[in-house]
Regions:
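C-terminal functional extensions of proteins
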Residues: 315-373
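Short, strongly hydrophobic alpha-helical membrane anchors
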Residues: 1-17
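Conserved active-site and cofactor/substrate-binding residues in soluble primary-metabolism enzymes
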Residues: 136, 146, 150-153, 200, ...
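…; additionally, a secondary subgroup of soluble metalloenzymes is captured
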Residues: 2-3, 22-25, 221-232, 344
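Electropositive, gly/pro-rich neighborhoods at or near active sites that engage anionic ligands
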Residues: 44-208
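Glycine- and small hydrophobic-enriched segments that form the cores of compact globular domains
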Residues: 172-290, 311-314
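Gly/Ser/Thr-rich active-site loops/lids in small-molecule metabolic enzymes
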Residues: 287-307
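Alpha-helical membrane-embedded segments
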Residues: 21-38, 210
């Protein structure tokens, strides 16, 4: 057979629309995509999602193993902690009914704090002599391991459900959300070494700024795991508030504010916190704003806003922008270097918005792991 004289025009009948081979080449793919298009797309997408699920599974197991190893090495439990830890990892929280929104915040606060108290007491039961520093580390590591396990379970459930029903539209939302889920999961996994070592994370920049201002000042505990110091600046009284470091905790600034307001008159509140940057924004950039700069599910912010409204206290905020990964992993040099600049901006904000003789509360918001005062 002479392949040098092969005539493609004759084979595909480029000039003849009635050629059967040419018609088959066009019609067969159309039929396949009409009747099996979703299934083909499902198979293609499934490969990408399977890789993500495999990663989530490895993150889940790695965080669990690191938590158990840390407890065995640092808490010296009397009994094997594996069964109790596995039970903790499967714990869930049912949020209160919100059909009637009246009083929902108090219910959520009660539910969340009850869970926190329960976890703290049961972790402490592993080793009653455990220091508060080690206790907060284990609590944070437990939350990370529990969150990674929940990520894995939800993604795996959605994937298996779509695959079982051959339902491509059901898998589309998962395909779109998976990159964001993986970004959070990878950040949590990379946060474990810093938290185990008791090193500062990006979210602690607010605590770091206020912690430096507290140095050589007398401190007092005004709320659970929350400390207060008093100082003066240009004939203005400053109240400095942050979570009690170097424990891995965010404290309870709203309860502390309630205590302070009951004893002293405040003329302004300045809150310093980390904030998620938008794509295209520079990491470690500083921005000023108005309103309560504090994350979480909203309980603390609601309480702070309510107290400020009742007492007619304006709330100013300064945030240091960073990515999700930077916020929960070891604090970068770029973010840490902004602490002094933020402090100078705080002083400038005090000059611009208060008069001599007035009082200002400065709250360093965020996880204070590795940050003293």
């Amino acid at each position: 057979m002479n392949f040098t004289n092969f005539d493609f025009d004759q084979l595909f009948a480029m000039g003849d629309d009635t050629n059967p081979l040419m018609m088959a080449i066009w019609i067969i793919p159309i039929i396949l995509f009409v009747f099996y298009g979703q299934r083909i797309q499902l198979y293609i997408t499934s490969g990408e999602i399977k890789k993500g699920i495999k990663k989530l599974d490895s993150f889940k197991e790695e965080s669990r193993n690191e938590l158990i190893d840390y407890i065995k090495k640092n808490l010296n439990p009397k009994d094997d902690p594996v069964k109790k830890i596995d039970r903790f990892l499967d714990y869930f929280t049912i949020m209160p009914v919100d059909m009637d929104p009246n009083g929902i915040v108090d219910k959520v606060r009660h539910t969340v704090r009850s869970r926190e108290d329960y976890t703290r007491e049961h972790v402490k039961s592993l080793s009653p002599e455990t220091s508060n520093l080690e206790l907060t580390k284990v609590q944070t590591l437990l939350e990370i391991a529990s969150s990674l396990q929940m990520f894995y379970k939800i993604v795996n459930h959605m994937f298996l459900t779509a695959k079982k029903q051959n339902n491509y539209p059901l898998i589309l939302p998962l395909q779109m959300l998976l990159p964001f889920i993986m970004e959070h999961a990878e950040a949590m996994k990379e946060a474990i070494p810093a938290l185990k070592a008791g090193q500062p994370i990006g979210d602690g920049i607010g605590s770091m700024v206020v912690g430096k201002m507290m140095l050589d000042r007398q401190k007092e505990t005004v709320a659970f795991q929350t400390v207060l110091a008093k100082t003066e600046f240009e004939n203005r009284k400053l109240f400095l508030l942050k979570a009690e470091g170097p424990s891995s905790t965010v404290g309870r600034p709203a309860d502390a504010l309630e205590t302070i307001v009951s004893n002293d008159k405040l003329d302004a509140i300045i809150m310093i916190d980390a904030a998620l940057k938008m794509e295209g924004e520079d990491s470690a950039s500083i921005a000023q704003g108005f309103g309560a700069a504090i994350g979480g599910i909203g309980v603390e912010r609601f309480q702070i806003e309510a107290i400020a409204t009742t007492n007619n206290i304006p709330i100013f905020s300064i945030v240091v922008k960073q990515s999700v990964k930077e916020a929960i992993t070891l604090m970068t040099k770029e973010i840490a270097d902004q602490a002094d600049d933020v402090r100078l901006q705080v002083y400038e904000m005090i000059r611009e918005n208060t008069k001599q003789g007035q009082s200002v509360l400065i709250i360093g918001v965020g996880n204070t792991a590795g940050v003293t005062q």
